[in-house]
From Swiss-Prot:
GO terms for biological process: translation; translational termination. This is Ribosome-recycling factor. Responsible for the release of ribosomes from messenger RNA at the termination of protein biosynthesis. May increase the efficiency of translation by recycling ribosomes from one round of translation to another. Keywords: Cytoplasm, Protein biosynthesis. GO terms for cellular component: cytoplasm. GO terms for molecular function: ribosomal large subunit binding. The gene is frr. The lineage of its organism: Bacteria, Pseudomonadati, Bacteroidota, Bacteroidia, Bacteroidales. Belongs to the RRF family. The keyword DNA repair does not apply. It is found in: Cytoplasm. PANTHER family: MITOCHONDRIAL RIBOSOME RECYCLING FACTOR PSEUDO 1, RIBOSOME RECYCLING FACTOR. HAMAP family: RRF. InterPro entries: Ribosome_recyc_fac, Ribosome_recyc_fac_dom, RRF_sf. It holds the Pfam family RRF.
Length: 186
C-alpha cells in the first residue's frame, strides 16, 4: 500500500527539482551585468573531452561590464574563444595572449524583451513540471484508495498536495518577477 507521506514527499521532490532547474536556467540568462555564471553552460574541448570553462581557466569579473578568463594552459586559448563564439550568448572574446576579456555590452530594449520572453518560457516549463508532479501525486493517491486508503485521507492528502503546489507556483512566479525586473532595469 502506498503511504500518503511518501506520495507527498515524492511530489515535493519533483517540484523542488523543477525550481532548481529554473534557478539554473535563469542564472544563464544575462541581465546586462557581468557574471561568471554566464559562462557555466559553455563547454570547451580539452584534450578530447568537453569540460566547463571553469575546469580549464580562472574566471573573474573585474568590473560590472567585463569578464576575464585566464586559461591555466596557454594552448586552451583557441578552444575557449571558439566555444564562446559558438555559444548563443552574443558576446565576443578578446584575446591579448595573457587573458581572454569579454566585454558585456549594455542590452538594447529589443534584447531585453527577448530575454524577458525567454525567462517566461523557462518559467512556464517549470510550472508545467510542478503541475505534472501534482498530477502524479494525485494519481498515486487514487491508486492508494484502490489499495485500501480511506477516501477522506485521500482528500486531505490532495488538499495538502494542492497547498504545496500553490507554494511552488508562487515561488516560480516570484523568481520570474525578480529576473524580469533585473532584465528590464536599465
Amino acid at each position: 500500500m502506498v503511504d500518503v507521506k511518501t506520495c507527498l514527499d515524492n511530489a515535493q521532490e519533483k517540484m523542488d527539482m523543477a525550481v532548481m532547474y529554473l534557478e539554473e536556467a535563469l542564472a544563464h540568462i544575462r541581465a546586462g551585468k557581468a557574471s561568471t555564471r554566464l559562462l557555466d553552460g559553455i563547454r570547451v574541448d580539452s584534450y578530447g573531452s568537453m569540460v566547463p570553462i571553469s575546469n580549464v581557466a580562472a574566471l573573474s569579473t573585474p568590473d560590472a561590464r567585463s569578464i576575464t578568463i585566464k586559461p591555466w594552459d596557454k594552448s586552451m586559448f583557441r578552444a575557449i574563444e571558439k566555444a564562446i563564439i559558438d555559444s548563443d550568448l552574443g558576446i565576443m572574446p578578446e584575446n591579448n595572449g595573457e587573458v581572454i576579456r569579454i566585454g558585456i555590452p549594455p542590452l538594447t530594449e529589443e534584447r531585453r524583451r527577448q530575454l524577458a520572453k525567454q525567462c517566461k518560457a523557462e518559467g512556464e516549463t517549470a510550472k508545467v513540471s510542478v503541475r505534472n508532479a501534482r498530477r502524479d501525486g494525485i494519481d498515486a493517491l487514487k491508486k492508494a484508495v484502490k489499495d485500501g486508503l480511506a477516501e477522506d485521507e485521500q482528500k486531505n492528502a490532495e488538499a495538502k498536495l494542492q497547498k504545496i503546489h500553490d507554494k511552488y507556483i508562487k515561488q516560480i512566479e516570484d523568481m520570474l518577477a525578480d529576473k524580469d525586473k533585473e532584465i528590464m532595469t536599465v
